[in-house]
Design a protein with these regions (language model features):
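Active-site-proximal substrate-binding core of FAD-dependent oxidoreductases
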Residues: 317-363
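Single conserved hydrophobic/aromatic residue that forms the stacking wall/gate
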Residues: 434-445
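Dinucleotide-binding Rossmann-like beta1-alpha1 core, especially the glycine-rich loop
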Residues: 3, 7-93
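Conserved FAD/dinucleotide-binding core of flavoprotein oxidoreductases
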Residues: 222-274, 295-306
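Alpha-helix-centered segments that form part of catalytic cores
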Residues: 75-117
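A conserved mid-domain beta-alpha-beta active-site/ligand-binding segment of alpha/beta enzyme cores
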Residues: 377-418
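Predominantly flavin-linked oxidoreductase catalytic cores and closely associated redox partners
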Residues: 110-225, 230-252
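A conserved active-site cap/scaffold subdomain adjacent to cofactor or substrate pockets
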Residues: 266-268, 280-335
Length: 445
């Protein structure tokens, strides 16, 4: 783990419920609830939220998503309410920084929430309370080399203290990818449209806990990147993501410190470097990469723990397909699932930058004018996230039918936040011809 405080998606809550974690796990891991991601200074149209909500359209209409964009166009770009407020019943509760449900018994099964948590403490708790009691043996050693068999599989890992034999090796060595990338020589596919490759990370204290311990993650755009704000119960995890193509490490640190102001630092700023991308083969021979060793996407949408969870589930699925018997098809299917997950999520993150109209620095001008977001090695996978066909914009007679009106996840919120509407004036005329009028549902202000 990078270990600077982690923000998770709502899908992580499903996993905690499945694991039946003890009630006190949040206290031990300094965890807080997360209902949304707030994007500040990413759009010239103001700040916007991406709240967690899987309850469908609040009016049970099949056109609620389209209705808001239709209303946006009909009001000449001045909608009476934001898209997030239009689609999310508990919008004002998020804004007021309150817990969404006051029935805590039913809240145990509530899924529209993620967490902010200390990833190091969380992993230590899992090892102590779940892994070791179930027979997992933890050896502390430094691996120096490996011994391969005639087929190229790793037969054993050679450590300073011992030699370790196994049928399968899971590479969790982080960005080093010591086994998958180092010993197996698996190459890396970059996501070239994601240019941020470094971050200064630090832990800070609170200056006003009542307002700063938010029930949502905050991402704030600066001149050369963006800052994350992940509030835990005792501290804040924060960091500045930037691209070294546009600013030096020293200048980025100075910009970050200026942003933090007089906030008390609880640790020294730590530089993190990475490559956005995915291993060409997440499963090679008898080695499987999980976590940072297999792939990484800059943390704008909290993909880190989600990909760890998904890859582990994909591996469990693969190993159960033929009673543990593994062949080329099983490995290929696993690799396809992992690469598809990472590619689609990478494009989802890229869409936050693709849709912005910020031009206040060389960094943002490059992002808006010089990056081809719609052309890469996964072109057939990159057009949608949350039922939103970005490659079919703007919607017209031919593409209108492809729009998934019932799926309000992902790109719908990002497009709305950037006022990137699928509805053109011409499309409005077309919709009027087929008797679709302005939204009839009463807007609540």
């Amino acid at each position: 783990t990078i270990g600077v405080g982690e923000s998770t998606t709502q899908f992580f809550r499903d996993w905690t419920l499945e694991m039946n974690l003890p009630d006190n796990w949040m206290d031990e891991c300094e965890a807080t609830y997360k209902y949304s991601v707030k994007f500040k200074n990413f759009s010239e149209y103001g700040d916007f939220h991406y709240p967690f909500w899987d309850g469908g359209a609040p009016s049970n209409s099949s056109c609620d998503i389209l209705e808001w964009f239709f209303h946006y166009r009909a009001t000449n770009g001045n909608p009476e309410v934001s898209f997030a407020e239009w689609m999310t019943p508990y919008w004002r509760i998020i804004e007021e920084n309150k817990v969404v449900i006051n029935d805590f018994e039913s809240f145990k099964g509530y899924k529209n929430a993620g967490y902010h948590l200390d990833a190091v403490k969380f992993s230590n708790m899992l090892k102590r309370d779940f892994c070791l009691p179930r027979g997992v043996v933890h050896h502390i050693d430094t691996i120096k080399d490996c011994i391969k068999d005639t087929d190229g599989n790793i037969a054993s890992l050679v450590g300073e203290k011992d030699i370790y034999l196994a049928d399968m090796f899971i590479d969790c060595t982080g960005f080093k990818s010591s086994i998958l990338g180092g010993m197996m020589g698996v190459e890396w596919d970059d996501f070239p449209f994601l240019i941020n490759n470094k971050a200064w990370a630090v832990r800070t204290g609170y200056t006003d806990k009542k307002t700063e311990m938010t029930n949502h993650t905050v991402c704030t755009a600066l001149d050369n990147g963006w800052v994350w704000h992940v509030p835990l119960t005792t501290r804040i995890g924060t960091g500045y993501n930037f691209s070294d193509k546009f600013i030096s490490e020293e200048d980025a640190l100075a910009e970050f410190k200026e942003f933090l102001g007089d906030r008390p630092l609880l640790s020294e700023p730590r530089l993190i470097e990475w490559k956005n991308g995915i291993a060409k083969k997440v499963w090679c021979k008898n080695v499987v990469g999980i976590g940072l060793s297999a792939g990484f996407i800059e943390p704008l949408e909290s993909n880190g723990l989600l990909s760890v969870h998904n890859f582990a589930v994909y591996l469990a699925d693969a190993l159960s397909m033929h009673d543990g018997k593994v062949n080329t098809l099983v490995r290929a299917h696993f690799n396809r699932r992992c690469r598809k997950h990472m590619s689609q999520f990478a494009h989802f993150v890229g869409n936050h930058f693709m849709m912005t109209t910020k031009t206040n620095s060389d960094y943002w001008r490059y992002i808006t004018d010089n990056i081809n977001y719609m052309d890469d090695q996964a072109e057939d996978e990159q057009g949608t996230h949350g039922g939103y066909p970005l490659d079919d914009f703007p919607l017209n007679i031919d593409t209108l039918s492809k729009f998934n009106f019932n799926d309000i996840a992902g790109n719908a919120y990002i497009c709305a936040g950037h006022m990137h509407s699928p509805i053109t004036p011409w499309t409005m005329d077309y919709l009027s011809l087929i008797h679709i009028s302005e939204p009839t549902r009463q807007l609540q202000i």
